[in-house]
């Protein structure tokens, strides 16, 4: 009884502390509803400039759009393959030598900390401008993400079947491929498809730093204020995301066993995937490094390992610590605001609560929200709030709404409604069912999704300075362009520590709740 009361007290204190942190983050960013009410129409006016889109420009969008899809597929495939091999070294239950596991985990976490836009900028220094740099950046980012996800999935597996097969005389490799790989692969491939969907959106903004794809065209048209053509680019990007997501949904259903599998279907799907991958490799042709590129790699490594300690601990609003605090505040406030709207949208987005046709329309709306690149949202909200972290909060909110609504909807779609239906038959009201049935049964999945999104948003918020939306992104890009790698190292080290602390916080919250 005492332990139960103690846990309840810990949960209440944790909840109060989290509420205080959230309120503090909103205050740091200067969030003001009055500004949104008075100047919200400016965002609407900006969006109106994009519509109706310039349909005559469609023909010039197709080629860079195809290049964007190629970059995403090739980068995801390469990163996922290397990530699978790294996952075996990442997992604690496979590698008995702790120093190997520690080194691998540190490298993976360091790379995972770096936003893909920053990876793309580094890649352009080494391999030059173009789609090859973007593909390599996506591959490296995917490798780090999938190595971590795969390693954690392996740790959750039981190795008893593997041990049993080796005990009866089977070779270790054969036993491993017939037990661990068979159990791991469906979930790993499904996660790879989620990453592919995200990479399509990442690839759409890499052109901002000259890393190829439709982002080059989008950045150009925004700079020239040809907003009707910007609208056409976004429409075409939405169509591409819709097609990719449709294919991804089919493949996930196939992997999960919801669609009947057979040998013929396996062969056809495998051949199609390989054909798409080989075709996508044309995006990375003529990859070569110059002597300057090799020097840049050396300078980057030297700068990161020899950071500017004075700059790292400098006080004032131009110091790393304050800018990182602002970045964290943007990420926390944006994630929380996005989560609130995502819950509301989930209720009108799931077939379990509303008719299927209405849910389909809702999902299209959410997909459209997810399609818009992050810096386009930044430009829209700067018209409302002016430059600064307030615009960053609204930008992170919109980015969070799209992805959290999808994660929440997946959780609801997989939710057994036995208790919900029983309470409904007993005459319990809708609000009461939400409070006493839905919330207790779904809160863990929702909380995990929010913490994952917060982790992503901290890295994403570190690039918002590109469009004047606050955070540490502006000095990070400036120092990279000026080859101040010691200052870049200072920023990345602090960013790494912050991401690591968020991960530890997430694990602690799982234990408490």
Task: Place the predicted regions along the sequence by residue.
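Generic hydrophobic transmembrane alpha-helix motif, especially the helices
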Residues: 108-142, 366-397
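Alpha-helical membrane-interface segments at transmembrane helix boundaries
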Residues: 62-70, 104-111, 197, 219, ...
């Amino acid at each position: 009884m005492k332990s139960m009361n103690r846990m309840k007290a810990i949960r209440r204190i944790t909840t109060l502390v989290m509420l205080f942190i959230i309120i503090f983050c909103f205050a740091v960013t200067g969030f003001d509803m009055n500004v949104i009410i008075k100047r919200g129409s400016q965002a609407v006016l900006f969006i109106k400039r994009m519509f109706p889109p310039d349909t005559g420009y469609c023909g010039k969008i197709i080629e860079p759009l195809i290049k964007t899809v190629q970059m995403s597929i090739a980068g995801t495939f390469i990163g996922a393959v290397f990530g699978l091999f790294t996952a075996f070294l990442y997992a604690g239950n496979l590698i008995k030598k702790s120093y190997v596991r520690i080194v691998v985990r540190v490298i993976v976490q360091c790379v995972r900390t770096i936003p893909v836009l920053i990876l793309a900028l580094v890649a352009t220094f080494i391999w030059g401008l173009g789609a090859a740099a973007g593909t390599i950046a996506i591959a490296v980012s995917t490798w780090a993400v999938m190595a971590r996800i795969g390693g954690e999935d392996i740790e959750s597996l039981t190795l008893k079947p593997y041990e049993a097969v080796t005990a009866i005389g089977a070779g270790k490799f054969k036993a491993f491929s017939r037990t661990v790989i068979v159990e791991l692969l469906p979930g790993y491939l499904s996660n790879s498809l989620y990453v592919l969907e995200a990479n399509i959106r990442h690839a759409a903004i890499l052109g901002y730093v000259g890393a190829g794809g439709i982002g080059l065209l989008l950045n150009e048209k925004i700079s020239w204020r040809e907003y009707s053509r910007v609208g056409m680019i976004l429409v075409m990007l939405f169509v591409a995301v819709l097609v990719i997501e449709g294919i991804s949904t089919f493949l996930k259903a196939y992997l999960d066993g919801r669609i009947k599998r057979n040998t013929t279907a396996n062969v056809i799907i495998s051949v199609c995937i390989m054909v798409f991958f080989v075709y996508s490799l044309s995006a990375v042709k003529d990859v070569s490094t110059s002597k300057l590129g090799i020097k840049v790699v050396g300078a980057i490594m030297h700068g990161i390992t020899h950071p500017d300690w004075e700059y790292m601990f400098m006080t004032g609003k131009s110091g790393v610590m304050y800018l990182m605090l602002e970045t964290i505040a943007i990420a926390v406030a944006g994630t929380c605001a996005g989560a609130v709207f995502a819950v509301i949208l989930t209720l009108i987005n799931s077939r379990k609560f509303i008719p299927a046709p209405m849910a389909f329309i809702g999902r299209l709306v959410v997909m459209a929200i997810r399609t818009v690149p992050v810096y386009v949202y930044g430009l829209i909200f700067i018209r409302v709030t002016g430059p600064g972290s307030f615009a960053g909060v609204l930008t992170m909110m919109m980015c969070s709404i799209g992805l959290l609504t999808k994660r929440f909807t997946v959780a609801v779609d997989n939710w057994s409604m036995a208790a919900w239906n029983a309470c409904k038959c007993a005459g319990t009201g809708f609000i009461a069912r939400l409070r006493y049935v839905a919330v207790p049964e779904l809160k863990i999945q929702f909380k995990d999704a929010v913490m994952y999104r917060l982790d992503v948003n901290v890295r994403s918020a570190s690039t918002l300075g590109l469009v004047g939306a606050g955070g540490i992104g502006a000095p990070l890009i400036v120092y990279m362009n000026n080859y101040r790698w010691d200052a870049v190292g200072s920023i990345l080290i602090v960013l790494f520590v912050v991401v690591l602390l968020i991960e530890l916080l997430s694990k602690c919250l799982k234990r408490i709740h």
